[in-house]
Amino acid sequence: MSLENFGNFLTLDEKHSFIKKYFKEFYTKDFKLFASKDKHYRTRAELSFYHENDTLFYAMFDPKSKKKYIIEYLDFADEKICAFMPKLLEYLRQDNKLKEKLFGVEFLTTKQELSITLLYHKNIEDIKSNLENLSNILHINLIARSKGKKLIFKTENLRQTLNIQDRKIFYEFNNDCFIQPNTTINEKMITWVCEILNTQKRMDLLELYCGYGNFTLALAPFFFKVLATEISKSNINFALKNCKLNNTTNIHFARLSSEELSLAIKKEREFFRLKDIRLDDFNFSHVLVDPPRAGLDKSVIDLIKKYENIIYISCNPITLKENLKELSLTHRVEEFALFDQFVNTPHLECGVFLSKV
């Protein structure tokens, strides 16, 4: 979430100075700061296409003024994206069928792989052979989308390996999953949580908003059992696959919203999706939440404040502060970390560790 409504905070030092004041009612100790490299840190990039005089350009449009900016290079994008951009553009410019009614492209990369998604305002079935040729000639994992249609060439799944405390964690996911877009910072966030857990008495872990298991797989060895919830069926399927990739057997995944989980734990409602999971068998010492920008609603806060330790990963300092007003009635902030996810922008990721008073 952007801090631009509060001022022009771009550097990590400026963000740190603001956050210290903004959260002073909850935390007065030293913040842990995690910097990112300045260039080629972002693994996801989305661009528009601009058509002029029968040729094609990458472009971005100002969301307020709608002013057009021709893009030739993205210094914040992963090196694999930067290297592939001119190759793709040259190929598209030479194929009129691929170029016609093409309006956008999405790049996604991991340490090992790259995929692209081309977005069209026309029936992509009509250019299926052209798209297949593009994928084969440029040796690229390609997805094409138009209204109600999706075509995949080679594969849409990407493999990722994260290095966490001398361990390698293996993942597979696709473009539809929520992905931390700065791999270096993602590794630092997970490592920060692991270092806290190293000092803790631990039983079982409850994780909400687990996605494809980004935190889950790395944290599982610290606990006897893990219950991780997520509403996306696709994410759950990837999470189960990632358990197999890492030979992890102590994680139980449930496709539930946080509100549904709250009802289930309070025994106010039974869910068929929990038929193979006995909630009474868990003894949660820690809960991890990584919510969307809207933060936690009251039902989730009421649920998690029952547990001894809370790890809160936030992409929105504004909703984090609102949630801490409630959580501070039962818990104390023990650690506060700032992760410069998007360098030289007003955006900031926060990590907070709370323990029961």
UniProtKB/Swiss-Prot annotation:
Asked if S-adenosyl-L-methionine is a keyword of the record, the answer is yes
> From which residue to which does any coiled coil extend?
none
Residues of the active site:
315 (nucleophile), 349 (proton acceptor)
One GO biological process term? tRNA processing
Keyword NAD in record: no
Q: Which GO terms describe its cellular component?
A: cytosol
Q: What is its EC number?
A: 2.1.1.-, 2.1.1.35
A single GO molecular function, which one? rRNA binding
Q: What class of enzyme is it?
A: transferase
**Span of the secretion signal?**
none
**Reaction(s) catalyzed by this protein?**
uridine(54) in tRNA + S-adenosyl-L-methionine = 5-methyluridine(54) in tRNA + S-adenosyl-L-homocysteine + H(+); uridine(341) in tmRNA + S-adenosyl-L-methionine = 5-methyluridine(341) in tmRNA + S-adenosyl-L-homocysteine + H(+)
Q: Which residues bind S-adenosyl-L-methionine?
A: 180, 209, 214, 230, 290
Q: Which UniProt keywords apply?
A: Methyltransferase, S-adenosyl-L-methionine, Transferase, tRNA processing
| HAMAP family in the cross-refs | RNA_methyltr_TrmA
Quote the function comment for this protein: Dual-specificity methyltransferase that catalyzes the formation of 5-methyluridine at position 54 (m5U54) in all tRNAs, and that of position 341 (m5U341) in tmRNA (transfer-mRNA).
What the record says about family reads: Belongs to the class I-like SAM-binding methyltransferase superfamily. RNA M5U methyltransferase family. TrmA subfamily.
Indicate what this protein is called per its UniProt record: tRNA/tmRNA (uracil-C(5))-methyltransferase
Species assigned in the record: Campylobacter jejuni subsp. jejuni serotype O:6 (strain 81116 / NCTC 11828)
Species lineage:
Bacteria, Pseudomonadati, Campylobacterota, Epsilonproteobacteria, Campylobacterales
